[in-house]
Amino acid sequence: MNVKMDDCFQFGLGAFETISVVDGRLIFLDRHLRRLEDAARFLDLGMPAERGIDRIAVLEYLRKWMSEHDYRDRSGRMRRCALKIMLTQKNVVFSMRDNPYTTDIYERGFAMDISNVRRNETSPFVYHKTMNYGDCILEKRRSRKAGMDERIFLNTKGQICEGTMSNIFFCERWQDIHTRDRLRSSAWNSKGVYL
């Protein structure tokens, strides 16, 4: 892989999406591509489709990767994977990795606590998935040292924002999944939800 130096590698000004792959299918691909487009517009990276990132390109990358790699577990079932798309001024990168969240981990449950680091709800960066991820990585490492699986970020008003590596969803009737920008509850606004 030949990656060129640009503002992403110097300042974290790049966008990414990590997409769950279950049984060879990309989960919420279109939603991820829309979110990547929003971040690319915000960071002035050019539109992903014009840079070679669209539904067809992502599906082709996955198909090619699956044809070249053994993606089945010992029982013959497809492993859960994650496809990551990274977009910077000068780079477009696709990568694959195993999804570390196994059935055993889900059955055990996740231990988490609240981070002392606060999100700045006035910063436009908190509304986009950017490569500027230092707080998340350091807090994830600290959570592991404290015996936790995850840490939750609050903003300066004490409202729930996100996890270090996870998104937070609110479910209504188990069919309707809402992130903070889609939630209709009066308790939630564009900057979080009160604890």
Locate predicted features.
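Glycine- and Gly-Pro-enriched alpha-helical subdomains that act as flexible
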Residues: 159-181
